[in-house]
């Protein structure tokens, strides 16, 4: 498809996923502005631009609802050719819905947001399993982090800490620390493949960075859709009960006024 009608963003974007991720939904960018401000870009793949309502592909995606992960098996929501066409793989300019956030460098407070439909060329697909052990709080705080996009990662981590602090004040309790999310990883192919159990530290710098940017995007777009009367799929939580609905509501567990499912369009 020809997406040349959409402007090409002037950013150096990068994504952070596992090495076996084929559906790269999101990426980020950082541009330092004059006057002590920084513009954060949260770039989300936009496969809906190439899918017509009620055509066969739309019906398949709606029937599957999400990508299914199982040990040794992954069934994707979208067919492989469509994933390859819209995945934010490095070196390709693909259509994105971008949320730009202007942030004060001193306080890390959000001054304004802007949403654009554009093309984004991802410079690098970074991988958790390659750099997660290197990206520590100690390395960030001491200025010794030595990975690609180190400056951007350090800045975004500090911004993410501010976003997390704001949410914790709303929800009235801190995020749990030290939790490990366990998952199955397939190494090799065919009958000789090995299934290994691996863990990811919740709250580790890279995990925190990605999680907070996605929560912020989903919260911002949820409020935006509500203001404009646009239908959406919302996740809310009141009195401990989590609901999925087309009616917006607060999410007490996350500490946000609205939370729309917007940031994983290739997978759900």
What are these regions (language model features)?
Residues 1-268:
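Electropositive polyanion-binding surfaces
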């Amino acid at each position: 498809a020809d997406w040349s009608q959409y402007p090409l963003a002037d950013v150096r974007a990068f994504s952070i996923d596992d090495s076996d991720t084929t559906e790269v939904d999101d990426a980020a960018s950082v541009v330092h502005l004059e006057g002590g401000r920084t513009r954060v870009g949260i770039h989300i793949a936009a496969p809906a631009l190439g899918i017509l309502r009620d055509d066969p592909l739309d019906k398949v995606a709606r029937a599957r609802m999400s990508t299914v992960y199982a040990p040794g098996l992954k069934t994707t929501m979208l067919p492989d050719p469509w994933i390859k066409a819209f995945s934010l793989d490095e070196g390709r300019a693909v259509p994105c819905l971008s949320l730009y956030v202007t942030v004060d460098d001193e306080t890390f407070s959000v001054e304004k947001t802007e949403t654009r439909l554009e093309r984004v060329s991802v410079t690098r697909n970074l991988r958790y399993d390659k750099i997660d052990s290197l990206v520590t709080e100690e390395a960030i705080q001491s200025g010794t982090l030595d990975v690609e996009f180190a400056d951007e990662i350090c800045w975004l981590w500090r911004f993410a800490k501010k976003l997390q602090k704001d949410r914790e004040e709303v929800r009235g309790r801190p995020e749990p620390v030290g939790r490990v999310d366990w998952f199955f990883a397939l190494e090799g192919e065919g009958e000789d493949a090995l299934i290994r159990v691996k863990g990811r530290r919740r709250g580790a710098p890279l995990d925190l960075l990605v999680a907070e940017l996605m929560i912020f995007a989903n919260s911002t777009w949820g409020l935006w859709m509500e203001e404009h009367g646009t239908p959406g799929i919302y996740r809310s939580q009141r009195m401990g009960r989590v609901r999925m609905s087309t009616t917006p509501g607060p999410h007490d567990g996350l500490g946000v006024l609205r939370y729309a499912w917007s940031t994983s369009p290739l997978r759900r």
